[in-house]
Amino acid sequence: MADLSYDKIEVGTEYGPWKYPLKERIARHLEAVENAHPWHHQRSPWGPPVAPPSILGNAALRFLDSIAPVPPGTLHAKHEIETAAALRLDRQPAGYGRFADKYEKRGRRWFVFETRWRDETGLIIGKSIVTMAFPSEQRTVNSDQEGRSQKSEIRERNGEMTPIVRALTQEKLTAYSEDSANALRGLSIHVQPEAAKKAGFETTVAQGLMSADYISEMMTSLLGKEWFENAKLSLASLRPVLSGETLTANGRLAESAPEGAVVRRTYEVWCENALGEAVTAGTATALVRPD
């Protein structure tokens, strides 16, 4: 199958339904991000165990792989994940996708891929929107510059949550990305060190969505069921994270506003490396019951 290309993307074209192999992948996914929350392994408030809401992000990338693999080194710039209902592990999720946009900006070519998800009963689970940039020689430079521009701002924030700390070993990176089209053909910058070095990195690079999983786990501990229903995670990737680094997820309440019978809470959330540099930052919002 030929790689995805900017010229061949047809904005608005619909794809799907495509079935994500949840039952086959969930154990490796949870292992990759070290998520031991009991709702994902034992009974949950919905009965059977459920998947982390953030899994819709990785499912969207595999859906994209089924259309055409992204060229190695494609930049994962932004990701939004909206949840409407919990995804039970005993049910089959199906995605419906489309290329929502493509454009040229700052000398690079970008595209936006949107997916909507239901389970086998027709229950709407949520949606995922990923923004990516095709490779260019300026990729690493731009990522570093964006990270430096956010560094001081993130340092000034005081995290108010119970942080999630994770060491990104190669074993974890492989477990997370081993089923990608590029990994299966030996071209993944997340799995194969040779591919990462060819792309200009010292070693393998963590998939940016791993930060989303850490933040989602943190929000699950904070909000419980309310993080699985009517919630949204919006994140930007600010700088690459290499194998061997340690990340810390944290956040703080930014706004709480009444919305009918419930309250909409907005949290500033981020992941930092050991130097205190932000690698991922954005917002998490959820509708919660009043205190």
What residues fall within each predicted segment?
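Hot-dog-fold acyl-thioester-processing enzymes
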Residues: 1-78, 139-229
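HotDog/MaoC-like acyl-thioester-processing domains
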Residues: 2-14, 78, 83-165, 237, ...
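A conserved acidic, glycine/proline-rich C-terminal tail/linker
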Residues: 230-234
